[in-house]
């Protein structure tokens, strides 16, 4: 038998039929819905007189538009001040009620960001195809699943047929070998990858992360890396199944039980790339070479190590790249050759589908403990990715650590990752953010976003500017 990649295996498991034009009909195991991309899809079902093909394959939760202050959440739907946002959340509630779809509503203890809720509920399982009307659905690939975002029209197709038409992509492997240095995280790995291959590097590919450094990551770390595969240009990101994958899934609400569990584990254990499998593109990094990363510009590929300087367009030979650097410098209000550590900040955001899980909050709290948010920081937000993450953090006392340090402790939601709810940047404000995109206006009109890990964000909050978190944590923490 021909050696196959993980992507090849997942594709073959779900290919219903192959069409003459080279596309295939692919079966979808899990569909996750939120309030922004689903209203028109549900309306399409109504107009056509259809019902969802498999109601139990769908779960939903509002996340993009929900407010994150306790007072606003306690006020229910009427507390959502923006009319469009309120209507979208209300419409999701009504649609899920009408069609019988399980929804974790805004004040349900299980509510949260779709890409946090799916895995923690066990609704994301190894070997599945998972789709959602959100580009960061690649997150779920951390479980050895074939997961990607879809548009609103495709949301309707999945609801109606449980299938999608797709063309198979090329295979790409990113190998990270070696031991991660002290203070370097999954977020730093994926930012370094994007810095190396660019935001178009993975175009047309399904990207598998592999290597000894990837295998040592927790499931939370693997989700962070797969989450940002889309920023590397790849629609799909994935990590092969191993004992960590299976241990994470075991006992979760949607996970199989009894004999079904044993059968599932037997299948899941085969979801690895064969040793001689062919990859169209292979990218290699040494873990020892990666340092804490900070994005400086208006694209995730504009990223540098903490000890570097903002680039100088005058020495860039490529005119297109030179223009891009000049525009980014102007928008970000930075100067050529400025040290990354000299970038002063206005706000700090710890959250998003990239970095809002319990491991992320523990890492940030370890830095914040016993320190205070710098007086120059206008606001430092910590937004858990779900109600269950929030409850776990509070059980561990992390909320008290953050509050004592001067951070705000919020309710779950997408929050400041994107300007679709009250948590926004003002024009010209610099933010150290654990989110995934730093485009112009992403966090608010004129806002300036710098992508970092949770530990780096916490270090920036207590310093007022970017610092190497390893210096704050001290050499003794290495032991």
UniProtKB/Swiss-Prot annotation:
HAMAP family: LeuC_type1 (MF_01026)
The protein, known as: 3-isopropylmalate dehydratase large subunit
Organism field: Xanthomonas axonopodis pv. citri (strain 306)
Cofactor: [4Fe-4S] cluster
Keyword entries, A-Z: 4Fe-4S, Amino-acid biosynthesis, Branched-chain amino acid biosynthesis, Iron, Iron-sulfur, Leucine biosynthesis, Lyase, Metal-binding
E.C. designation(s): 4.2.1.33
Family listed: Belongs to the aconitase/IPM isomerase family. LeuC type 1 subfamily.
Enzyme class, broadest EC rank: lyase
Keyword Iron: yes
């Amino acid at each position: 038998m021909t050696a196959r990649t993980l992507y090849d295996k997942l594709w073959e498991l779900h290919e219903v039929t192959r069409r003459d034009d080279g596309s295939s009909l692919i079966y979808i195991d899990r569909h996750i819905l939120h309030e922004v991309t689903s209203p028109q899809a549900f309306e399409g079902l109504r107009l056509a007189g259809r019902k969802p093909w498999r109601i139990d394959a769908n779960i939903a939760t509002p996340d993009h538009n929900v407010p994150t202050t306790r007072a606003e959440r306690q006020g229910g739907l009427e507390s959502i001040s923006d009319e469009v946002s309120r209507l979208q959340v209300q419409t999701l509630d009504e649609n899920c009620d009408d069609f019988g779809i399980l929804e974790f509503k805004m004040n349900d203890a299980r509510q949260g960001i779709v890409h946090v809720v799916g895995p923690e509920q066990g609704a994301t399982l190894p070997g599945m195809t998972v789709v959602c009307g959100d580009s960061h659905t690649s997150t779920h690939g951390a479980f050895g699943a074939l997961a990607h975002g879809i548009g609103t029209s495709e949301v309707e197709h999945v609801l109606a047929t449980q299938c999608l038409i797709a063309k198979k992509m090329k295979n790409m492997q990113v190998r990270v070998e070696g031991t991660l240095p002290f203070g370097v995280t999954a977020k730093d790995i994926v930012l370094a990858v994007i810095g190396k291959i660019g935001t178009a590097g993975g175009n047309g590919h399904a990207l598998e992360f592999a290597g000894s450094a990837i295998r040592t990551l927790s499931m939370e770390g693997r989700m962070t890396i797969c989450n940002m595969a889309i920023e590397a240009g790849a629609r799909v990101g994935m990590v092969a199944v191993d004992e960590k994958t299976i241990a994470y899934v075991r006992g979760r609400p949607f996970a199989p039980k009894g004999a079904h569990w044993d059968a599932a584990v037997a299948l899941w254990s085969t979801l690895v790339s064969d040793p001689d499998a062919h990859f169209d593109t292979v990218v290699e990094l040494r873990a020892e070479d990666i340092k804490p990363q900070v994005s400086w510009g208006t694209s995730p590929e504009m990223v540098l190590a903490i000890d570097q300087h903002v680039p100088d367009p005058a020495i860039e030979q490529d005119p297109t790249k030179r223009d891009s650097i000049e525009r980014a410098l102007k928008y970000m209000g930075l100067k050529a050759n400025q040290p990354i550590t000299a970038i002063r900040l206005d706000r700090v955001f710890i959250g998003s589908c990239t970095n809002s899980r319990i491991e992320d909050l523990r890492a940030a709290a370890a830095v914040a403990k016993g320190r205070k948010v710098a007086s120059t920081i206008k606001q430092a937000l910590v937004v858990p990715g779900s109600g269950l993450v929030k409850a776990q953090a509070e059980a561990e006392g992390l909320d008290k650590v953050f509050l004592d340090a001067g951070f705000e402790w919020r309710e779950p939601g997408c929050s400041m990752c994107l300007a679709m709810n009250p948590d926004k940047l003002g024009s010209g404000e610099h933010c150290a953010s654990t989110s995934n995109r730093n485009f112009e206006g992403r966090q608010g009109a004129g806002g300036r976003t710098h992508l970092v890990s949770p530990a780096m964000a916490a270090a920036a909050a207590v310093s007022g500017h970017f610092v190497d978190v390893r210096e704050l944590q001290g050499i003794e923490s290495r032991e």
